[in-house]
Amino acid sequence: MLYSNFKSLNKKISKVGLGCVTFGREITEDKSIRLLDVAVENGINLFNTSYYYSDGISEKILGKFFKIKKNRKDITIVSKIHGDLSKKTIEKCIHESLIRMKTDHIDYYGVTHDPNINLDEILEIMDRFQKEGKIIRVACNNYDISMLKSSKRIQEKNNFSKFGLLETVYNVLYRGAEKELINYCDLENIDIISYSPLGAGFITGKYR
């Protein structure tokens, strides 16, 4: 396995991460646990999940895996929420994610865009959780360059925690991140992970 140095955590992270969106949905709990085992045996140390994946079952499966294997400290967890990003919802989701995954912290916790909530309110509550140590770094999902810059202005003005990670779509068919995002994030020490690197299977020739 090849590894990259994630500046935002100062950790070596496997270049291949394991997405857990199908856990508890297309893949049973037992098969998910076996898949996690194989991933770790092959050097993968990044698991990417979400509060909403399989109505929370994905995070619960990770929690069961960590309890069985006693290897939480060896794994970097990425989780996230979308939709309603009110203070009440963010607090509820982060607390439940911690309980589900049987951990006292989540390495990266991401937010998307909620047009109904002021961005400064979202960044303020995420900053609180980072400073409390319940999340190690604040992350964002599908932010474009203008949203990243707007966030930076708010974060610097209020001394809020800055983003440590951007999760965005990037593969050989969708290469928009190459225009500005990659360079900007490199300058701002924001690490990047891509989702749908195989285009949900279309790039592999699965669908004809």
Features from the language model and the residues they span:
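N-terminal binding-site loop/beta-alpha segment at the start of enzyme catalytic domains
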Residues: 1-75, 131
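Conserved, mostly hydrophobic/aromatic
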Residues: 6, 18, 32, 39, ...
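Short, well-ordered coil/turn segments that N-cap beta-strands
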Residues: 11-16, 43-46, 71-75, 103-107, ...
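Conserved residues at the C-terminal ends of beta-strands
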Residues: 19, 50-53, 109-112, 141, ...
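Active-site mouth loops of central-metabolism enzymes
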Residues: 19-30, 80-89, 111-117
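Short, acidic/polar
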Residues: 27-40, 85-102, 119-124, 145-153
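A short, structured active-site edge motif that brings together acidic residues
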Residues: 73-84, 108-112, 166-169
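Beta/alpha (TIM)-barrel catalytic core signal, keyed to glycine-rich beta->alpha loops juxtaposed to Asp/Glu
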Residues: 114-208
